[in-house]
Structure formats: structure tokens, C-alpha cells
Amino acid sequence: MLLKEYRICMPLTVDEYKIGQLYMISKHSHEQSDRGEGVEVVQNEPFEDPHHGNGQFTEKRVYLNSKLPSWARAVVPKIFYVTEKAWNYYPYTITEYTCSFLPKFSIHIETKYEDNKGSNDTIFDNEAKDVEREVCFIDIACDEIPERYYKESEDPKHFKSEKTGRGQLREGWRDSHQPIMCSYKLVTVKFEVWGLQTRVEQFVHKVVRDILLIGHRQAFAWVDEWYDMTMDEVREFERATQEATNKKIGIFPPAISISSIPLLPSSVRSAPSSAPSTPLSTDAPEFLSVPKDRPRKKSAPETLTLPDPEKKATLNLPGMHSSDKPCRPKSE
């Protein structure tokens, strides 16, 4: 297990980011999706927790085979996805990632949002008070991102919001900028496979860090697109974008109808009703079936006639032990 705490500051308030993070997640997922790969939304519905109150539950499938390193692609199926389950009780969220193909792999993320510059060192005392962990600050303006994801229009050093007047962040902006908020993320990665654990857990944390950096940069760079939205408007945007994303990936309906299967209680999320099913059949596939009208191929005569022993001499057939030369014992 490898545990790290990430702190990402934003030139926003926590109340503003409630709309911004929903907008960013939907648009980012749509942009990163393509035919056969991307983020499929399986479930997105209100959810009530006895402790945290009202929230939103989402389940997604993240198809990412081409984004895996070569050493990982060699051991996973071609159609490979990670299941994401998230419980959003903003300003507190829980996100879990699992993979049925890799049962010993999981990512658990707890997120809390506060209006400060990442100065709360006790924010996760209830979750991991005595657990040793590395604290990593992510600077959306100054930290480098992978070159293939860089866009000047999404660079906080160059972008300036027309609606808020915020932007063109410079080194040290977190010390003086107002407003400012921080996303605190406690990330636990587990891959309990001997010989690969350290390598995989470190790799996953690198990917998580890159995604957090890119996503938070985009949330700010897109602020003029979502700043005036209401919650109802961003939920409608979310619904429409998710539908378009599923079509973009190429999600097809299940092979058989499963609508007659009773739904599980909302607290049980292990088998979503939209999971594809495989019809059971004892018949062989058509391409393996032998046509009934095909003539039987004869590779041998239907009857076998043996020679008459009495005619053996006249036919001049050799005996079983006959030989032109006498048999001689092998010399020792």
C-alpha cells in the first residue's frame, strides 16, 4: 500500500467550485474519450447517506488500454476497464477504483475542500491520523504537465478570466491571491502482487498526480463557461455530455434484456443493472455446426475383402516369415 496526500490550490471559492468540478469532470471525460476508449457513465443518481446526508452517486467504466505502459498492456485483456464509484457529499467526496481482472488492485480517494491555501495539516485526522504519508503540493500554474496534454488556452500563467478578472497566475500566487481554496486528497493505492507492487503503486500515483494537475487547471481555465451556471443547469449539461460521451465511445446495449431483474437497494452497488449480460445456450455457434445436407466424405471403402488363404500360393503372396535370404543370428 502506498499512501499520499495531495493539496491543490485554486483561485476560486469552495462554493464556486461546487459547480466548476461537475462541469470540468463532464467536459474532461468527453474530451478524453474516443471510439472504444474513454469514460462510460453507468449510473448517476441522487443518494442519501445516514452520516453524510444527501449526495450524488456515480458509477463509471474507464476504458484505458492504450494509455497503459507497454509492460502492463502485455498482461491485461485488450478490452480493459477500471470501475469508478464515487459518492459526492460536497465538500466531502469518496472515490474508489477497482478492476475485476486485477482483484488485488484498488485506489481509494477521500477529498475535502476548504477555503485556505493548503495550510490545514489536521484535515484527515479522523481518517489517517497516525498513518505516515507524503504530502504533495500541486501548483496548477507552475508544475509541468505531460507535453501531449498542454494547451496554451488552459495554462493559468496565460489565461485570464473575463467574468472574474482572475488569472495569469505567477510563481508564488498561492501566498497572495484572493480568493483561494484547496482540494485536499488522501489517495491510497494498493497492488498486492509480489514483485510488482512497488513499481505499479508508484506508477499509479504518478498517473493520479498528472490527472489531478490537468483537471484542476482545466476547471479554472473553463471558469467563464460555467461561472454563471446554476446547479440545475450544470446537472443538465452533465446529463447531455454523458449521453454524448457514451455514444462517442460506442457503447452498445446488452445482448439480452435484464429489465425484469429486480433492482438491488440503493446501498448495494456491486452489480449495476446496466452491466452487459451473456445469453446462456447449449447450442453450438452457427459457424461450428455441421450442415445436415452435407454429403459424407468417404476416405475408405465401406467393406474390406481379405484374400482367400487357399489362393495364397497361386497369388504368390509371401509368408509372414518368408525371405530370400536365411536369417542369421547377430554377431556378438
From Swiss-Prot:
Q: Which residues cross the membrane?
A: none
GO terms for biological process, alphabetical: phospholipid transport; signal transduction
Q: Where is the composition biased (Low complexity)?
A: 267-285
Provide the Gene Ontology terms for cellular component.
cytoplasm; cytosol; nucleoplasm
| Residue ranges with Basic and acidic residues bias | 322-332
Q: In which tissues is it expressed?
A: Ubiquitously expressed.
**Gene3D superfamilies annotated for this entry?**
3.30.530.20
Pfam families xrefs: IP_trans
Q: Which InterPro entries match?
A: PI_transfer (IPR001666), PI_transfer_N (IPR055261), START-like_dom_sf (IPR023393)
**Which catalysed reactions does the entry list for this protein?**
a 1,2-diacyl-sn-glycero-3-phospho-(1D-myo-inositol)(in) = a 1,2-diacyl-sn-glycero-3-phospho-(1D-myo-inositol)(out); a 1,2-diacyl-sn-glycero-3-phosphate(in) = a 1,2-diacyl-sn-glycero-3-phosphate(out)
Positions carrying Phosphoserine: 119, 270, 274
Annotated compartments: Cytoplasm
Q: Where is this region: Disordered?
A: 267-332
What is an example of a GO molecular function annotated in this UniProt entry? phosphatidylinositol transfer activity
Q: Which UniProt keywords apply?
A: Cytoplasm, Lipid transport, Lipid-binding, Phosphoprotein, Transport
| Residue pairs linked by disulfide bridges in the UniProt entry | none
Phosphothreonine modification, residue list:
278
Query: What's this protein's family per the entry?
Result: Belongs to the PtdIns transfer protein family. PI transfer class IIB subfamily.
Stated name of the protein? Cytoplasmic phosphatidylinositol transfer protein 1
The scientific name of the source species is Homo sapiens (Human)
Q: What gene is this protein a product of? A: PITPNC1
